């Protein structure tokens, strides 16, 4: 199964206009685990990014993580995409360039086992459904900055998907979803909320589009199973743990050391290369 990571750096440079691009150590380590475990268990993986991201990975010697290559396709993303509100827009543009069947995978999401048996049947699948929490997934009236997009043509009762991992087995549906999500973003250049607009475009529209097109859609897990261990060791998603680590240096270091130890155990040769990176080497000591 073909998978891809993505990395669009424009949001970073909007937040940090005078900084050199960098990725935190724990994110580099989870990126390595995500790519290498995918290759071992599920197939090939590529990185779709922009030139600053590619140069950064090259400078660290990490391009080998993606056996299918590193492609700066996101250099061509339109300038009118609001990169503050739509900070993950690069994922959707990357998906628009990858034919089905494919898996869209976040760099902080790790598949420890083969998932081919879970993907037999659906046109699209994602890691889990999300509750319609009003502060995250508000009603249609919250999108006052969106003009020219048919918000009222969708079913607002359908639970959104979390797309840390998303599978697209039907190419017609993949194109419909990405076209719809990109259209929404381009109809919202003045979007003024950094959460609700993005998760609508990426996560809520996926389930809405599936409902509208009568596509077969599946959730591969659920939140209690994902974070309680009941999903039999298939998945790890770091997302909810990031802020805790940033606030607790001991937790941060312990996590990085555990990632390094797992890399050394599962990928002894590759881990030697990763351990040579200056900002990562202390965690391999």
Give the positions of each predicted feature.
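N-terminal anchoring/stem segment of glycosyltransferases
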Residues: 1-78, 241-285
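Catalytic core and acceptor-binding pocket of nucleotide-sugar-dependent glycosyltransferases
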Residues: 156-246
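A conserved donor-nucleotide-binding helix/loop in the catalytic core
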Residues: 26-28, 32-34, 76-104, 112
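Short glycine/proline-enriched coil/turn segments at helix->beta-strand junctions
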Residues: 41-44, 97-102, 120-123
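Short glycine-/acidic-enriched loop or helix-start segments at secondary-structure transitions
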Residues: 57-59, 104, 113-116
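Short acidic donor-binding/metal-coordinating loop in glycosyltransferase active sites
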Residues: 107
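Conserved donor-nucleotide/metal-binding helix-loop-beta segment in metal-dependent transferases, i.e.
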Residues: 111-147
